Curated annotation (Swiss-Prot):
Keyword tRNA processing tagged: yes
One Gene Ontology molecular-function label: 4 iron, 4 sulfur cluster binding
Protein name: Epoxyqueuosine reductase QueH
InterPro entries linked: QueH (IPR003828)
Recorded catalytic activity of this chain's protein: epoxyqueuosine(34) in tRNA + AH2 = queuosine(34) in tRNA + A + H2O
Top-level EC class as recorded in UniProt: oxidoreductase
Pathway: tRNA modification; tRNA-queuosine biosynthesis
Keyword terms: 4Fe-4S, Disulfide bond, Iron, Iron-sulfur, Metal-binding, Oxidoreductase, Queuosine biosynthesis, Redox-active center, tRNA processing
Job description of the protein: Catalyzes the conversion of epoxyqueuosine (oQ) to queuosine (Q), which is a hypermodified base found in the wobble positions of tRNA(Asp), tRNA(Asn), tRNA(His) and tRNA(Tyr).
Alphabetical GO biological process terms: queuosine biosynthetic process; tRNA modification
The family this protein is said to belong to: Belongs to the QueH family.
Keyword Iron in record: yes
Amino acid sequence: MIDLQEILANMNPNQKINYDRVMQQMAKVWEKESVRPSILMHVCCAPCSTYTLEYLTQFADITVYFANSNIHPKDEYHRRAYVTQQFVSEFNAKTGNTVQFLEADYVPNEYVRQVRGLEEEPEGGDRCRVCFDYRLDKTAQKAVELGFDYFASALTISPHKNSQTINDVGIDVQKVYTTKYLPSDFKKNNGYRRSVEMCEEYDIYRQCYCGCVYAAKMQGIDLVQVKKDAKAFMADKDLDNDFTHIRFSYRGDEM
């Protein structure tokens, strides 16, 4: 499988990298070699899963990895996890794809320890970089454990997230593990606009903050109301059993 470093090695080191173009070049190599790689793609919510799945399922087998201990409160975390699974299930039914869903443990105290001392950082600052690293590291670890060809992140679809930073982090994480990072800039080529269209098509809940308690407070988000709304949404839902048909299975065992 092609490594992004093979492409970067042929570029001018002073040239700004267009990660969307790099991803397209990698996809062309897969097609030329008649391979369909397996990708463990970190997603933070259903909206960021939309166009990313529509695009990548043309070339690869995707498992979405919901690793988001940064999301607060817990009820909101459960809501986003549920809506993501609901979208994946409906996307598969509509398109004939077989995208799978895998969820990491929810350990918010671990996230809080990671960003200690960065609580007052502005959105897009050092706290965000640490958060990207924390979640991409978990994704890479799981990709190695389960034998995926690549790990990736759907975060680059957001116009509020710095794709350069996310890709820099992904490249650094790749150096630590025996797996490959798939770079991206999913917002390019009208990717973000398409994600908004798909949210309307699938009637997807679009949250008003990234999930981080610190960013939410800076934005003036009413977390009490968020918790109340999430609780009401989940009241008649069965998070454990409603979407077992899309859960990732490894050697025949559901994870």
